[in-house]
Design a protein with these regions (language model features):
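Conserved glycine-rich cofactor-binding loop
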Residues: 16, 23-25
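Substrate-binding pocket helix/loop in short-chain dehydrogenase/reductase
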Residues: 102-103, 107-115, 211
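Active-site helix of classical SDR
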Residues: 126, 163, 171
Length: 255
C-alpha cells in the first residue's frame, strides 16, 4: 500500500556543534549555517581577536557563537579545554593550512606544518570528540572539510593533496569503526572558494584561468555554496550517509 513519506528534517535544535577554524572563511560560514539551523555552536581558533570579531558579526544577525581559544595542534590543550565543555553532537573540522610549492622544492618545515594541522591535529581532536560521543550514547556527525584536492592532483599542491587524500582515508576508517555507535563521519570537499585565503592565488590571471577552465560550472565557489551541504551532513536528513565524500566542486572531478 502506498504511504506518504515524511519530509527530511534539516533542523539542528538542541544539538551542540564544535567548528574548528571557525573564526574565518569556510569554518565561520559553517558555524553560521549550523546556528541558523538551530544548533548551539562553539567556534574554535587560535586568535582571540578573530574569534571575538566573528562572534560579534554573528550577533548582529541574532546568532550566538560561543568562542574557544584553542590551538588544535596542541593535543594536551585540546584534552584540557574540551574536557571543560559539554559533549558535542556535531564536529566540523575546518582548520587547515596550505603551503604551495613545486614537489621538488618542498621543505621539511612546510611538509610538517601542513601535515600537523590538516591531518594530525584533525585526527586527535576527532578522537577526543568521538570518544565522548560514544561514551555518551550520542549518535553524532563528524564532518571533515576536505577538498577536491583529496580526489585529484594539483600543480604545486603535493603536500596539500597528500594531507587531504589521507583525510579521505581516515574518514572511511572512522566511519567503519564508529558506525555501530551511530556516529556518522563524512567529508565535504569544496573546489576553490572565494575567501581571504584563496585571494592571493586567484589574483594570478594564469592560475585563475586554470581554475575556471576546470570548474565545469565556470565560476568560483562561494561560502554560501558550502553552508547548505554542512547543514545537510550534520542533520537527520543525512541519517544513512557515512564514509562518504560530498563534492562541492562545480564538476571539477567529473572528468
Amino acid at each position: 500500500m502506498l504511504t506518504l513519506p515524511s519530509s527530511p528534517d534539516f533542523r539542528l535544535d538542541n544539538q551542540r556543534a564544535l567548528v574548528t577554524g571557525g573564526s574565518r572563511g569556510i569554518g565561520f560560514a559553517a558555524a553560521v549555517a549550523l546556528a541558523r539551523a538551530g544548533a548551539q555552536v562553539w567556534i574554535a581558533a587560535r586568535n582571540a581577536g578573530q574569534l571575538s570579531e566573528a562572534a560579534g558579526l554573528a550577533a548582529q544577525d541574532g546568532l550566538r557563537l560561543q568562542t574557544l581559544e584553542l590551538d588544535i595542534t596542541d593535543t594536551a590543550q585540546v584534552r584540557q579545554r574540551l574536557g571543560a565543555l559539554p559533549d558535542f553532537n556535531i564536529l566540523v573540522n575546518s582548520a587547515g593550512l596550505a603551503r604551495h610549492q613545486p614537489f621538488l622544492e618542498v621543505s621539511e618545515e612546510n611538509y610538517d606544518a601542513v601535515m600537523a594541522l590538516n591531518l594530525r591535529a584533525t585526527f586527535f581532536l576527532s578522537q577526543q570528540v568521538a570518544r565522548r560521543m560514544k561514551a555518551g550514547g550520542i549518535a553524532g556527525s563528524i564532518i571533515h572539510i576536505s577538498s577536491q584536492m583529496g580526489h585529484v592532483g594539483g600543480p604545486e599542491r603535493s603536500v596539500y593533496c597528500a594531507s587531504k587524500f589521507a583525510l579521505e582515508g581516515l574518514t572511511k576508517t572512522m566511519a567503519l569503526e564508529l558506525g555501530e555507535a551511530g556516529i556518522r563521519v563524512n567529508t565535504l570537499c569544496p573546489t576553490f572558494i572565494a575567501t581571504e585565503l584563496s585571494r592571493a592565488s586567484l589574483s594570478d590571471p594564469e592560475f585563475s584561468r586554470y581554475v575556471l577552465d576546470n570548474i565545469k560550472l565556470r565560476r568560483l565557489g562561494t561560502l554560501e555554496d558550502v553552508m547548505g551541504p554542512v547543514v545537510f551532513l550534520a542533520s537527520p536528513a543525512a541519517a544513512l550517509i557515512t564514509g562518504a565524500a560530498l563534492l562541492v566542486d562545480g564538476g571539477w572531478t567529473a572528468t
